[in-house]
Design a protein with these regions (language model features):
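N-terminal beta1-alpha1 cap of cysteine-dependent amidohydrolase-like domains
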Residues: 1-232
Length: 232
């Protein structure tokens, strides 16, 4: 801490607040030492302790009076925030009453961050409904009529997210067919929703070559068309 602050001061920057990441609480002696050597008030040395859940962090920083100290530095009023909704959310997260397992079927499942927005949305939905959401990552290329039973035997829902390109498309369509025929809750996002239309057209209506023009320009049943502003 002292070395990094000294480097900042060497560039003419004097920090007003220091937030210290720590696994254990900082005692007053440590805070006083940081205050002395970094040239700022002791009550501007705050601790940011490890938490079990990311969403607890704002609550812990409020306990450290971070907002109050920031407003003091900026000469602003600092009314007490109403964090009751946030506290309820964290309580739901810490005390779930049920659990679901959702199969996320994609072609980049080895790189979980590729679907981070979907993962976080599932987590948020779980928090709201007092439910732990476990994600089963499924490589779309492994899904076939022969493997589907084994892959999806233990899931309570199937999600096919957005994507592009041909690879894995038939596996996604098979996952969608399995969800429909086994009455498993399904959500298709972007390409996932388009492929749900393709699957229904093929297996229910009987348009066996139904497809998206983006993926198969020669299909005789183009149930998904490219928007005019996407045509090169």
């Amino acid at each position: 801490t002292q070395a990094s602050v000294k480097e900042l001061q060497g560039m003419g920057i004097q920090p007003d607040i220091i937030v210290c990441r720590s696994e254990h609480p900082l005692d007053n002696g440590i805070k006083d030492k940081i205050s002395l050597f970094c040239n700022l008030p002791a009550d501007h040395v705050l601790q940011n302790l490890d938490v079990d859940y990311l969403y607890e962090a704002p609550l812990t920083m409020e306990k450290e009076h971070l907002a109050q100290v920031v407003c003091e530095c900026l000469h602003l009023d600092c009314p007490k925030p109403d964090l009751s909704d946030w506290e309820t959310m964290v309580d739901n997260l810490r005390h779930p009453v049920s659990k679901v397992r959702i199969a996320l079927v994609g072609k980049y499942v080895q790189l979980h961050d590729a679907y981070i927005s979907v993962v976080e949305a599932l987590k948020h939905g779980g928090i709201y409904s007092h439910t732990t959401v476990e994600i089963k990552w499924v490589d779309a290329e492994t899904v076939t009529p022969e493997t589907a039973d084994e892959i999806f035997k233990d899931v309570t829902g199937i999600l096919v997210p957005g994507g592009f390109g041909h690879r894995g498309v038939e596996g996604k369509i098979e996952a969608i067919r399995y969800a429909r025929t086994h009455k498993i809750p399904f959500l298709g996002i972007c390409l996932g929703m388009q492929l749900a239309i393709v699957e229904f057209a093929r297996n229910v209506i009987g348009f066996h070559d139904a497809h998206s023009l983006e993926l198969n320009p020669s299909t005789t049943h183009p149930v998904i068309h490219i928007m005019q502003d996407q045509i090169g």
